[in-house]
Amino acid sequence: MPATNILANLFVTLYNNETRRKGECTILPTSKLGIEVLKTLQKDGYIGEFEHIDDKRGGKFKIKLLAKITKCGAISPRFKVKTDEFNNWEQQYLPAYDRGMLLVTTNQGVMSHHEATQKGIGGFLIGYVY
């Protein structure tokens, strides 16, 4: 049965494997947005190395977990957020001011809300991690 929301599937699989203390996990199917989200999570130190395996059936990710994710999830529907509105959404989804990050898709790619605030750009919220 095909996944209806590939991004939500990615976050749920990461969360389930982290809570079970697994060292690595496999996520399928893949997407370009999923690759960008994983690059952002890797850059901020939430996951280790990951590789994309093309098996001609949608592909899959093999991800090394670092046991740094307490909670993560997709935000649906994708709310449009201006630069000065990140604090309101941060209070809604994150447990503390300086803990975790919101994932934002912008015209410059997927990035954390901290990076988007520094660059002075807004975008659509796609997920949260802490």
Curated annotation (Swiss-Prot):
Gene Ontology, cellular component aspect: cytosolic small ribosomal subunit
Name of a matching Pfam family: Ribosomal_S8
Keywords: Ribonucleoprotein, Ribosomal protein, RNA-binding, rRNA-binding
A Gene Ontology molecular function term of the record: structural constituent of ribosome
Top-level lineage group: Archaea
Biological process, per Gene Ontology: translation
Oligomeric form and interacting partners: Part of the 30S ribosomal subunit.
Record family assignment: Belongs to the universal ribosomal protein uS8 family.
Role description: One of the primary rRNA binding proteins, it binds directly to 16S rRNA central domain where it helps coordinate assembly of the platform of the 30S subunit.
Protein name: Small ribosomal subunit protein uS8
Species per Swiss-Prot/TrEMBL record: Nitrosopumilus maritimus (strain SCM1)
